[in-house]
Amino acid sequence: MSKDVIEYSKLFAKLVNTNDDTKLDDTIASFLYYMFPRELFIRAISLLESSDMFIYILDRVHNKEGNEHTSLIDVLVDEFYKGSSNSLLEYRLIVKDTNDGAPPILVDIAHWFCSCEEFCKYFHEALEKTDEKVELHDVLINEVDDHLQFSDDRFAQLDPHSLSKQWYFKFDKICCSHLLAFSILLRSSINVLKFFTVNSNKVFVIAIDNIDEWLNLHINIVE
């Protein structure tokens, strides 16, 4: 399905019921179910409701006594939805692996990467299918340099701040439930973000204001 026709982020934005913001819209959810293979959408929603997703923020400014959680959500809103962040936000998207003893899963929607086995599997398959004469970049990334063809879709978009070109990762070739879940959360709407982080409190936003703890987080991921 062409990204010129379907704007996935706008569909994600409609996931929360407009008449009751404590519920998901079943019609939109059913529609999205058929738009992704391997039951990816169902697995992504299950992940969002699993309490296994975490957003860690290196927080030097907003970690105040009192309304800390709300202020952290505001930081995410500024970064992902308003584009009004005054400085580069340092954050990490982490999923707790359900396998005992396995390291946490690192998710990077900005560069369309995930450390999970599913992502690695499809990435290696793409490598094996790629002709040596063809650049992997051309196989996995859709580059748009015609302004008339620019899209408002933010799903699987790389470097969204560029004014001269747009790049989209071809998610139909490589996608996993972790990337889809965090994209639904951070590339949709403020209502969807707050639905999972505040209303249902299933996705946890955690501030780290100590650089040693921040570095330790990365060590745990590598291990």
From Swiss-Prot:
GO cellular component: nucleus
Compartment(s) of residence: Nucleus
Role description: Plays a role in a RAD51/RAD54-dependent homologous recombination repair (HRR) pathway to repair MMS-induced lesions during S-phase. Required for error-free repair of spontaneous and induced DNA lesions to protect the genome from mutation.
Protein family: Belongs to the SHU2 family.
Origin: domain of life: Eukaryota
Keywords: DNA damage, DNA recombination, DNA repair, Nucleus
Quaternary structure and interacting proteins, as annotated: Component of the SHU complex composed of at least CSM2, PSY3, SHU1 and SHU2.
Protein name as annotated: Suppressor of hydroxyurea sensitivity protein 2
Single GO biological process annotation from the record: DNA recombination
